Amino acid sequence: MSFNHREIEKKWQDYWEQHKTFRTPDESDKPKFYVLDMFPYPSGAGLHVGHPEGYTATDILARMKRMQGYNVLHPMGWDAFGLPAEQYALDTGNDPAEFTQKNIDNFRRQIKSLGFSYDWDREINTTDPNYYKWTQWIFLKLYEKGLAYMDEVPVNWCPALGTVLANEEVINGRSERGGHPVIRKPMRQWMLKITAYADRLLEDLEELDWPESIKEMQRNWIGRSEGAEIEFAVDGHDESFTVFTTRPDTLFGATYAVLAPEHPLVEKITTPEQKPAVDAYLKEVQSKSDLERTDLAKEKTGVFTGAYAIHPVTGDKLPIWIADYVLMGYGTGAIMAVPAHDERDYEFAKTFNLPIKEVVAGGNVENEPYTGDGEHINSEFLNGLNKQEAIEKMIAWLEENGKGQKKVSYRLRDWLFSRQRYWGEPIPVIHWEDGTMTTVPEEELPLVLPKTDEIKPSGTGESPLANIEEWVNVVDPKTGKKGRRETNTMPQWAGSCWYYLRYIDPHNDKQLADPEKLKQWLPVDVYIGGAEHAVLHLLYARFWHKVLYDLGIVPTKEPFQKLFNQGMILGENNEKMSKSKGNVVNPDDIVESHGADTLRLYEMFMGPLEASIAWSTKGLDGARRFLERVWRLFVTEDGQLNPNIVDEPANDTLERVYHQTVKKVTEDYEALRFNTAISQLMVFINEAYKAEQMKKEYMEGFVKLLSPVCPHIGEELWQKLGHTDTIAYEPWPTYDEAKLVEDVVEIVIQINGKVRAKLNVPADLSKEALEERALADEKIKEQLAGKTVRKVITVPGKLVNIVAN
């Protein structure tokens, strides 16, 4: 008899809901365990089979930890602001709030159908004013600390969408959505000073149990480098510019300088003869993204300004060029070019026939740049020194002569925080007619997003909120001064920067969260999600957390102690699942046909959690067959408990494999090696089928081990075993080291290195006794007839090799 997954899964999901089985109490004397999923964006497409992979992994941990006696916090919520809902509203004229709510209801239904043990009383939604009140409150704190400021920055402006796009939303000079052309133009934007935390964001990575690859990505993103800032005067102008270089020792090899096209000096120093060429070049650059501009493989382009810089040491005149491979947002937006010892500068110099001067010996700069170390040459007071000595000596000279200084630079830029969007958190700031600005007072938060039918870009670069006159225009009740609300909204990252804190105290309307509760639960013990958030989300959340730590709001320096990235589930054809390819698998269909337990088991058994693996219907069927095998072992045709499950079997053949299973499954779950844990559960079932009778204690232990992966069938079998309560808080099985040892081992007997027989002997048999047994074996005696034994090599517990001729 097969089990009816539809009946069983509905029965237990109803039970958990009615009994609030997974409600997390705040008051508890148990140790805490906080296990978190990256909360999803509730899209119109609903859940796909990639979501449950990470969710099942955290659920297994949560369920095991409850059984191990921990007070477990395992919550779920919705990262529900963002571009797709707004785009949908633009396309259909529907309200993004209604659309979002409908999607959330669908996601919640789907997630509940998979049997995850979330505490739904703690559900949060970033678009709920009671939630984003605190997102806005954090913004006020950032502003008070001088970490939120407005600045004129070049942004990716998409005229067709009427909005600014983040770098990640621009691909090859076009918008990711719709493929519209994107240009760079300066606009006043809100920025967050994440650079003020660069060193701490870098140093504190050391203490985290994160994959090394993710730490490395964060290190590279922050990109700390030590070097010098050097000032170059412009010949014939009362102007100068600064460059940052990690190799001030090569200053004597500088033969030209390059400014970023957006550099403010370009306008001032370009000569009339060069102006047409410069203007044409600036127009061409506008449509390129930073990524395209810095692509190492692309042709170098540039144009001469007609102006010259004065070399700070020699007084030589160096031509000043502009080129798109220099970015205004990186370093100072200007470089000194040392073509003999830098690949990009070398290519540029070759393309435009600029001089190349060798200052570090060891290469052949006629053919290629030399980037290695070596003795300095053609460098006046640096001649004969190696790289490190020369760097120190040059910095000392620059500082003595007022021409430069030692400097640490970062690749990390301040975070562009404003979006010209409707569907985001309003930024709580008012701009007054006298040019001042103030923040909305704390007691007036949340500043609620107004409902509107007019969700279309304003076209001026402001958000659609600019169209809502009665919301935008305000008057100061004290002075009668007129003002306009900030019309930009926050990016989707804002709500996800701190959501893990709100789960700890989701209904608190007096503060972000109770400090005592934060102390009790932080940091998050395990955080699981996709690697696509390796840099930005995790870096932004760490930044906000550190700000809150400095304000005394959170008690830990870091939010997430252990991080794990699950791999991707690909389509059966090994391609990424996508609607356009028609290879998306909907979990609803699988829950209907095979059951949630089968889906959970299959996704955990596919392979290592971090690997990307193709979906296989055959594999799914195999998972279902295993569960049916388990069911038949426990339950008779007429639905009773198998009578061969007894308190004291006559012959206890399962003892060793049971203790091995408890040990391996427990260790593998802890280490997130779910596929090998499930293999061991299969080994146990195979052995149990061979046994005449099965000890009830072992069978109960097995059900406990299976239940975190397959909770519905776990509960049902637990009930069949005679229990009336849920299995969720039953104590986790333990094993006895002494019972893991094999009593009997199989020994291989070889003659001249070839296997001739096998023997089962007691595991603790001595070397001498083993040799005796081997020589007395009937098969071996036959093989040795007429031969002389020259030597016997014995390895206890493994083999006996007899050398004879």
UniProtKB/Swiss-Prot annotation:
Its EC number is 6.1.1.4. A motif ('HIGH' region) lies at residues 40-51. It catalyses: tRNA(Leu) + L-leucine + ATP = L-leucyl-tRNA(Leu) + AMP + diphosphate. A motif ('KMSKS' region) lies at residues 576-580. It is an enzyme of class 6 (ligase). GO terms for biological process: leucyl-tRNA aminoacylation. It is found in: Cytoplasm. The keyword Ligase applies. Keywords: Aminoacyl-tRNA synthetase, ATP-binding, Cytoplasm, Ligase, Nucleotide-binding, Protein biosynthesis. One of its GO terms (cellular component) is cytosol. InterPro entries: aa-tRNA-synth_I_CS (IPR001412), aa-tRNA-synth_Ia (IPR002300), Leu-tRNA-ligase (IPR002302), Leu_tRNA-synth_edit (IPR025709), M/V/L/I-tRNA-synth_anticd-bd (IPR013155), Methionyl/Leucyl_tRNA_Synth (IPR015413), Rossmann-like_a/b/a_fold (IPR014729), tRNAsynth_Ia_anticodon-bd (IPR009080). PROSITE patterns: AA_TRNA_LIGASE_I. ATP binds at residue 579. GO terms for molecular function: aminoacyl-tRNA deacylase activity; ATP binding; leucine-tRNA ligase activity. It holds the Pfam family Anticodon_1. CDD domains: Anticodon_Ia_Leu_BEm, LeuRS_core. It comes from the Bacteria. Belongs to the class-I aminoacyl-tRNA synthetase family. This is Leucine--tRNA ligase. The lineage of its organism: Bacteria, Bacillati, Bacillota, Bacilli, Bacillales.
